[in-house]
Regions:
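A short, structured loop/turn motif at beta-sheet edges
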Residues: 14-18, 70-75, 96-106
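Residue-level preference for beta-strand/loop junctions
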Residues: 3-5, 49-51, 61, 89, ...
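Beta-strand/loop substructures that line and gate deep hydrophobic ligand-binding cavities in soluble
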Residues: 82-134
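Hydrophobic pocket/interface hotspot
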Residues: 20-24, 31, 55, 69, ...
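Hydrophobic ligand-binding cavity/cleft-lining segments
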Residues: 1-45
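Short alpha-helical
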Residues: 29, 64, 115
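Glycine-rich portal/gate segments that line the openings of hydrophobic small-molecule binding cavities
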Residues: 12, 42-86
């Protein structure tokens, strides 16, 4: 099996960990509210706020992806996997939260992924990092 590529970026958010956790995990199916590239999202399995829940996200009229919650440590870490990205065989994302102040949190986002063909990973990394800072 080919090695997964890794991309990490840290984003400072002007909100406490509780507010961020509420949006990331307890409102998992509502990513379209804050992610500008998502037209729609809906829960297809389980319930918001539980491990194993699944959502489908629609990007434009032709692309959709399915995401599953793999792991959740309340107020600290959320891990998901995704399927349906063109040219991507495997992708997993981990969101780690660190409180910086009363209304300031660092969100460390780590993606691990494998593309087909492998050369696509180089171009994908640049695009992913840029898009993350627009959310």
């Amino acid at each position: 099996m080919a090695k997964l590529k890794s991309l990490q970026t840290d984003i400072r958010v002007n909100a406490n960990r509780e507010k961020i956790w509420e949006v990331l995990f307890n409102q998992f199916s509502e990513i379209n509210i804050y992610h500008p590239g998502t037209n729609d999202s809906r829960l297809t399995k389980g319930k918001n706020g539980e491990i194993g829940c699944q959502r489908v996200c629609q990007f434009g009229s032709k692309m959709s992806i399915t995401e599953n919650v793999l792991e959740a440590i309340p107020l600290e870490k959320l891990a998901i996997d995704a399927n349906g990205f063109p040219g991507v065989k495997d992708i997993m994302a981990t969101f780690s939260l660190r409180q910086l102040g009363a209304e300031s949190t660092e969100v460390a986002i780590t993606f691990r992924y494998r593309t087909i063909p492998a050369i696509l990973a180089m171009f994908m990394s640049r695009s992913m990092k840029k898009n993350l800072h627009q959310v």
